[in-house]
């Protein structure tokens, strides 16, 4: 049965208009983006199938075009739509972060980092550069490595902070393997970086580790020097 044959109150678009987007399931929201299904499957059925295949909405929305194209009804148009949605969401979160006092709004930082780094396939490190009021100046990518290796040079982070006239910074990196727990190397690197930043009167406020499911804060774990 096509969605047009459903009771009006159960159709995703009508349901959104009547009850708001939060009332829709992941599959219903995705169906609105997909617009149409495939032969024998409504857009909602296709959305449910794709969510089951990819395991989560985040993995589906960040899938590469080649992988999406392996599924009937999916291709470059769907990939483009998903990429646009992700980028709009990232920019909205960045705007919220830019307007917030970072230390008083750690959830916004965590949400931004999860959205920005959580679905990366390789390890990526970023720095959030802050002014004296702990407001965001800029977000800069520090490095991008393989799944198991990522090299960050402390002197480059120090130079970046000075070039941006930052008073403090937060660093973050993802663990593509899925475990958010800090390694001994993560802890030692954080200590060395904090010491180096103190020599130029810039504070290292926190170090976050990000996975697709969670975010860990060194400060909350009691691991900041």
From Swiss-Prot:
| Record-linked InterPro entries | MPN, RadC_JAB, RuvA_2-like, UPF0758, UPF0758_N
Q: Which residues bind Zn(2+)?
A: 173, 175, 186
- Residue ranges for motif JAMM motif? 173-186
> Which keywords does this chain's UniProt record carry?
Hydrolase, Metal-binding, Metalloprotease, Protease, Zinc
**What does the record give under GO molecular function?**
metal ion binding; metallopeptidase activity
- Signal peptide positions are none
Q: Which CDD domains match?
A: MPN_DUF2466 (cd08071)
What Pfam families has UniProt attached to this entry? RadC (PF04002), UPF0758_N (PF20582)
Similarity comment: Belongs to the UPF0758 family.
**Name of the featured protein:** UPF0758 protein NMC1174
Originating species: Neisseria meningitidis serogroup C / serotype 2a (strain ATCC 700532 / DSM 15464 / FAM18)
């Amino acid at each position: 049965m096509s969605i047009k044959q459903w009771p009006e109150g159960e159709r995703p678009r009508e349901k959104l208009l009547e009850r708001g987007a939060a009332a829709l399931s992941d599959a219903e929201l995705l169906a609105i983006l997909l617009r149409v299904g495939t032969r024998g499957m409504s857009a909602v059925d296709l959305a449910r199938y794709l969510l089951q295949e990819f395991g989560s909405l985040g993995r589906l929305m960040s899938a590469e075009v080649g992988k999406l194209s392996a599924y009937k009804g999916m291709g470059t148009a769907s990939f483009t739509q998903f990429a646009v949605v992700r980028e709009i969401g990232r920019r909205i979160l960045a705007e919220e972060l830019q307007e917030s006092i970072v230390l008083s709004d750690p959830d916004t930082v965590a949400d931004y980092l999860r959205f920005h780094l959580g679905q990366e396939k390789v390890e990526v490190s970023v720095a959030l550069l802050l002014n004296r009021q702990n407001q965001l100046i800029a977000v800069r990518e520090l490095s991008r490595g393989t799944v198991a290796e990522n090299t960050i040079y402390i002197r480059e982070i120090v130079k970046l902070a000075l070039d941006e006239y930052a008073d403090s910074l937060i660093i973050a990196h993802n663990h593509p393997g899925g475990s958010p727990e800090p390694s001994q190397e993560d802890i030692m690197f954080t200590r060395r970086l904090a010491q180096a930043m103190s020599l130029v009167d810039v504070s290292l406020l926190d170090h976050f580790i990000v996975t697709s499911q969670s975010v860990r804060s060194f400060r909350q774990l009691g691991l900041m020097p």
